[in-house]
């Protein structure tokens, strides 16, 4: 009788530090710092006609971040900021719901990074995020009665740190392979390796990776054929070399050789994003939904910088 495999148990080496990092995530002073308060009002001048914006982009970004971290509706987040300013006796205005909704459409979100200076191993993947629709329990019990809509969040993750280095939001009719070049364009550092699943087994993906002088660790699809004849004088294709090696040693052995299992870090990051911030967005427009998801990615990076678990198999 075949015995059922038991999951290994893991323990933390840095439990005290990681516990403090988890507590720090909920600190208001982390998300609403003195620097944010000082830069709350917009002082930049565009030189164009019309009244300049009252609030800085940092102020709008901070409110959107508080909404994501504390799982509040936008109006409730505005109420939170009003109460904080009242408690601190700060005579600062707070943007209205209409202002927040409008400014969120065009807000530029930059991912906070801790650059290491070394060439990166980027692992890529995507996940679906529900925009609107019925709850899973209702669907299971009674079936669908209306259409459900999804957005796709595409991520590039630093294999060494778990930090998000690139993020793109699309509608659900974009394939993973179409978005990979855009993800790599967001990475300023040198890239030594790019890992992804079979959805990235496309010519444009290999071209984008080769343009960065990186190694592609992408398993060819099970019915894959050689793209370029072995006797040609042209440069050997990494994809064809991977396919030949898989035929020699098997797919499982090839994955071990190239460290393909590290690709699961992208899935772990997706899981963290959904567990911390939820599996759906509340904004009505696509631009607002994209901003919500990118704000979550930026907040997740800041949480990563506070401290990550250092685990070992017990």
Identify the function of each model-found stretch.
Residues 22, 168, 310:
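Short, flexible helix/strand-to-coil boundary loops that buttress conserved ligand/catalytic motifs
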Residues 56-57, 61-69, 251-314:
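Basic, amphipathic alpha-helical segments enriched in Lys/Arg and hydrophobic/aromatic residues
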Residues 33-34, 117, 310-313:
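Short coil/turn segments at secondary-structure boundaries
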Residues 2-7, 11, 198-274, 283:
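Helix-centered, glycine/charged polyanion-binding patches within enzymatic domains
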Residues 88-91, 302:
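Short arginine-rich
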Residues 45-61, 65-75, 79, 83, ...:
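Polybasic low-complexity intrinsically disordered regions
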Residues 1-49:
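Basic, low-complexity segments
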């Amino acid at each position: 009788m075949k015995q059922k495999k038991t999951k290994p148990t893991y323990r933390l080496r840095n439990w005290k530090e990681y516990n403090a990092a988890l507590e720090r995530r909920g600190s208001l002073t982390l998300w609403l710092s003195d620097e944010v308060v000082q830069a709350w009002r917009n002082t930049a001048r565009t030189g164009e006609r019309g009244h300049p914006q009252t609030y800085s982009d940092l102020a709008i970004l901070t409110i959107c971040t508080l909404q994501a971290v504390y799982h509040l509706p936008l109006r409730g987040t505005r109420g939170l900021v009003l109460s904080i300013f009242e408690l601190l006796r700060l005579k600062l205005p707070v943007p209205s719901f209409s202002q927040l909704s409008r400014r969120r459409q065009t807000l530029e979100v930059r991912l906070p990074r801790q650059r290491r200076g070394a060439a990166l191993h980027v692992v890529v993947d995507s996940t679906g995020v529900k925009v609107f629709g019925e709850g899973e329990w209702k669907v299971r019990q009674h079936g669908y009665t209306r259409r459900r809509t999804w957005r796709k969040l595409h991520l590039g993750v630093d294999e060494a740190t778990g930090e998000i280095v690139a993020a793109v939001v699309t509608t659900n009719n974009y394939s993973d392979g179409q978005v990979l070049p855009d993800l790599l364009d967001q990475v300023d550092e040198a890239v030594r390796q790019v890992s992804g699943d079979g959805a990235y087994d496309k010519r444009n993906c290999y071209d984008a990776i080769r343009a960065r002088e990186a190694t592609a660790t992408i398993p060819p699809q099970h019915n894959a054929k050689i793209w370029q004849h072995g006797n040609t004088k042209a440069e050997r294709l990494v994809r064809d070399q991977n396919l030949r090696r898989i035929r020699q040693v098997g797919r499982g052995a090839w994955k071990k050789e190239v460290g393909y299992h590290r690709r699961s870090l992208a899935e772990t990051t997706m899981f963290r994003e959904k567990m911390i911030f939820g599996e759906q967005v509340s904004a009505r427009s696509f631009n607002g939904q994209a901003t919500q998801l990118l704000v979550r990615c930026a907040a997740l990076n800041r949480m990563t910088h506070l401290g990550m678990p250092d685990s070992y198999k017990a």
